[in-house]
Amino acid sequence: MEKFGLKALVPLLKLEDKELSSTYDHSMTLGADLSSMLYSLGIPRDSQDHRVLDTFQSPWAETSRSEVEPRFFTPESFTNIPGVLQSTVTPPCFNSIQNDQQRVALFQDETLFFLFYKHPGTVIQELTYLELRKRNWRYHKTLKAWLTKDPMMEPIVSADGLSERGSYVFFDPQRWEKCQRDFLLFYNAIM
């Protein structure tokens, strides 16, 4: 084990081991001699008040190279924007909510839940909320969860008309799944 320890490394650093000195690249262990580079920069070898790192950027810095402008092309879709490159095309509609409403109607429930939770306070959240309402999903304000009536069971309305008991399907955003359970629902707790 000693041959892999620090004791075996000391003769290598001091260049005492003649066997290894012929096959081992000592610049990998000891580093490179920077005195010639310091001399080319006009720095005396034993200057204590000047540090090399203050003037040396990087050995890979290409300061003499002129900047080359890369080849590029302008896509045709960019040239068709009004006011850009003298285009006369009618302006595109970037904020069209009507197109987004049609797209949102095609999504599955799980995708709508993802959009609802991913984009809080945006138009996308409002559109997904409206679409989920169309699909009979309601948001429970206290539980902070979405629920809908189980289509196979009709809930029983209470005598006072303020609540109903039945089987509901809840969407659990933590486990990202729909789960069914019996529940007493108060109407004032849902949106």
Curated annotation (Swiss-Prot):
GO cellular component: CCR4-NOT core complex; cytoplasm; nucleus
Top-level taxon: Eukaryota
Major place of residence: cytoplasm
Location of the protein in the cell: Cytoplasm; Nucleus
A GO biological-process term: deadenylation-independent decapping of nuclear-transcribed mRNA
One Pfam family this sequence matches: NOT2_3_5_C
Key words of the record: Activator, Cytoplasm, Nucleus, Repressor, Transcription, Transcription regulation
Keyword Cytoplasm: yes
Biological role stated in the UniProt entry: Acts as a component of the CCR4-NOT core complex, which in the nucleus seems to be a general transcription factor, and in the cytoplasm the major mRNA deadenylase involved in mRNA turnover. NOT2 is required for the integrity of the complex. The NOT protein subcomplex negatively regulates the basal and activated transcription of many genes. Preferentially affects TC-type TATA element-dependent transcription. Could directly or indirectly inhibit component(s) of the general transcription machinery.
Additional observations: Present with 2120 molecules/cell in log phase SD medium.
Subunit note: Forms a NOT protein complex that comprises NOT1, NOT2, NOT3, NOT4 and NOT5. Subunit of the 1.0 MDa CCR4-NOT core complex that contains CCR4, CAF1, NOT1, NOT2, NOT3, NOT4, NOT5, CAF40 and CAF130. In the complex interacts with NOT1 and NOT5. The core complex probably is part of a less characterized 1.9 MDa CCR4-NOT complex.
Family note: Belongs to the CNOT2/3/5 family.
This protein's name: General negative regulator of transcription subunit 2
Organism: Saccharomyces cerevisiae (strain ATCC 204508 / S288c)
Gene: CDC36
